[in-house]
Amino acid sequence: SGSKIGNGCFGLPLDRISNTSGMGCRNPIQNRPKSTPGGS
């Protein structure tokens, strides 16, 4: 549930935050598994 929201990041228009802050898609859990493969 939240496949579309999680895809972005926190469920907000990360289109700008992701580019401006860069922390929008870097803190979400979706990016976590990518950073540490085999963590799950």
From Swiss-Prot:
Record flagged with keyword Disulfide bond: yes
GO MF annotation terms: hormone activity; peptidase inhibitor activity; toxin activity
Main localization of the protein described in the UniProt heading: secreted
Disulphide linkage map: 9-25
SMART domains associated with the record: NAT_PEP (SM00183)
Subcellular location: Secreted
One family name in Pfam for this protein: ANP
Transmembrane segments: none
Keyword tags: Disulfide bond, Hypotensive agent, Metalloenzyme inhibitor, Metalloprotease inhibitor, Protease inhibitor, Secreted, Toxin, Vasoactive, Vasodilator
Domain of life: Eukaryota
Expression sites by tissue: Expressed by the venom gland.
Protein's GO biological process: regulation of blood pressure; vasodilation
GO cellular component labels: extracellular region
Region described as Disordered: 17-40
Polar residues: bias regions: 17-34
Further details from the record: Negative results: recombinant PtNP-a does not inhibit platelet aggregation.
Protein purpose: Snake venom natriuretic peptide that targets NPR1 and possibly NPR2. Exhibits hypotensive and vasodepressor activities. Recombinant PtNP-a demonstrates a dose-dependent stimulation of cGMP production via the natriuretic peptide receptor 1 (NPR1) (EC(50)=563 nM) in Madine Darby Canine Kidney (MDCK) cells. It also inhibits the angiotensin converting enzyme (ACE).
Similarity remark: Belongs to the natriuretic peptide family.
Protein name, per record: Natriuretic peptide PtNP-a
Natural source organism: Pseudonaja textilis
Organismal lineage: Eukaryota, Metazoa, Chordata, Craniata, Vertebrata
